[in-house]
């Protein structure tokens, strides 16, 4: 049985002090959690150390928003896998649409990051995929998304796919207030799961966690999670306040 995985992506919000306050509020309220339910938050790099201390021993796990595929060297502004592990990071988001857009990350670069991360002790790497509004309107959604899946997972073995989470995040629904309908989201999630079966095996397909991301909130989370191939959510704006993030959590568990 696949776990339910809710991840809060805080993007470029909060100083260390601000992030610590919100992290403490969330950790304090989530006192008990079933084994099949996972909650993660990804503060900015500068807040990782303090947030790690705040959630230590709690039911909240620590993630990072990106990383370099290089271990060290002349890579100004980047952060390596080992640096993240030093802070207690267990999960890393890779290939987010904002990184693809603003940092010009290609499928090939994202694949290098996936392969680099798999050489380290992260529990899971979250590979994000999704189409733009123009691509959806042109009927290219599945072609684009499945291509991103295949390229992102290039050279990833059957054993390593167990450490990959996929997140479908339609670019047109991120930060816009627009959300894919449950039917639209389920169609893509189902196609992704079938693609994993083609690339790997039925077992890999049955077990891989596929999240939805795109203006998720307390009002729409339940209907999204009722779909058979949606296993969780990658949550942006609604995860920034403890109250709204906790409402989402409580509407699911």
Curated annotation (Swiss-Prot):
User: For binding substrate, which residues are annotated in this chain's numbering?
Assistant: 9-11, 175, 215, 236-237
Pathway(s) per entry: Carbohydrate biosynthesis; gluconeogenesis; Carbohydrate degradation; glycolysis; D-glyceraldehyde 3-phosphate from glycerone phosphate: step 1/1
Question: Which N-terminal residues, if any, form the signal peptide?
Answer: none
Enumerate the catalysed reactions.
Answer: D-glyceraldehyde 3-phosphate = dihydroxyacetone phosphate
Q: Which terms does the record give in the GO molecular function aspect?
A: triose-phosphate isomerase activity
Which InterPro entries does the record match to this protein?
Aldolase_TIM (IPR013785), TIM_sf (IPR035990), TrioseP_Isoase_bac/euk (IPR022896), Triosephosphate_isomerase (IPR000652), Triosephosphate_isomerase_AS (IPR020861)
Q: What SUPFAM superfamilies is this protein classified in?
A: Triosephosphate isomerase (TIM) (SSF51351)
Q: What Enzyme Commission number(s) apply to this enzyme?
A: 5.3.1.1
**Cellular component aspect of the GO annotation:** cytosol
Q: Does the keyword Cytoplasm apply?
A: yes
Active site at 96 (electrophile), 169 (proton acceptor)
**Cited PROSITE patterns:** TIM_1, TIM_2
Keywords from UniProt, A to Z, are: Cytoplasm, Gluconeogenesis, Glycolysis, Isomerase
Q: Where in the cell is it found?
A: Cytoplasm
What GO terms describe the biological role, i.e. biological process, of this protein?
A: gluconeogenesis; glyceraldehyde-3-phosphate biosynthetic process; glycerol catabolic process; glycolytic process
Keyword presence, Cytoplasm: yes
| Domain of life of the native organism | Bacteria
| Family listed | Belongs to the triosephosphate isomerase family.
Function, in words: Involved in the gluconeogenesis. Catalyzes stereospecifically the conversion of dihydroxyacetone phosphate (DHAP) to D-glyceraldehyde-3-phosphate (G3P).
List the PANTHER family: TRIOSEPHOSPHATE ISOMERASE
Q: Could you describe the subunit structure of this protein?
A: Homodimer.
Q: What is this protein called?
A: Triosephosphate isomerase
Q: Source gene?
A: tpiA
């Amino acid at each position: 049985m696949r776990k339910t995985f809710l991840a809060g992506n805080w993007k470029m919000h909060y100083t260390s002090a601000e992030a610590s306050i919100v992290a403490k509020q969330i950790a304090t309220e989530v006192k008990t959690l079933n084994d099949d339910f996972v909650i993660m938050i990804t503060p900015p790099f500068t807040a990782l150390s303090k947030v790690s201390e705040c959630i230590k021993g709690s039911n909240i796990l620590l993630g990072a928003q990106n990383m370099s595929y290089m271990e060290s060297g002349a890579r100004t502004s980047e952060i390596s896998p080992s640096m993240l592990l030093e802070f207690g990071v267990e999960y890393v988001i890779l290939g987010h649409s904002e990184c693809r857009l603003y940092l010009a990350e290609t499928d090939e670069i994202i694949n290098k990051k996936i392969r680099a991360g798999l050489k380290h002790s992260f529990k899971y790497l979250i590979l994000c995929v999704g189409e733009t509004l123009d691509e959806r309107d042109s009927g290219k959604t599945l072609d684009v998304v499945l291509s991103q899946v295949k390229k992102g997972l290039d050279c990833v073995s059957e054993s390593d796919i167990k450490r990959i989470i996929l997140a479908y995040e339609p670019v047109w629904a991120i930060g816009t207030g627009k959300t894919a309908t449950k039917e639209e989201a389920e169609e893509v999630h189902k196609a992704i799961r079938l693609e994993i079966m083609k690339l790997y095996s039925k077992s890999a397909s049955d077990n891989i966690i596929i999240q939805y991301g795109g203006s998720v909130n307390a009002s729409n989370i339940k209907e999204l999670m009722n779909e058979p191939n949606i296993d969780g959510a990658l949550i942006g704006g609604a995860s920034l306040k403890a109250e709204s993030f906790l409402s989402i959590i409580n509407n699911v568990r």
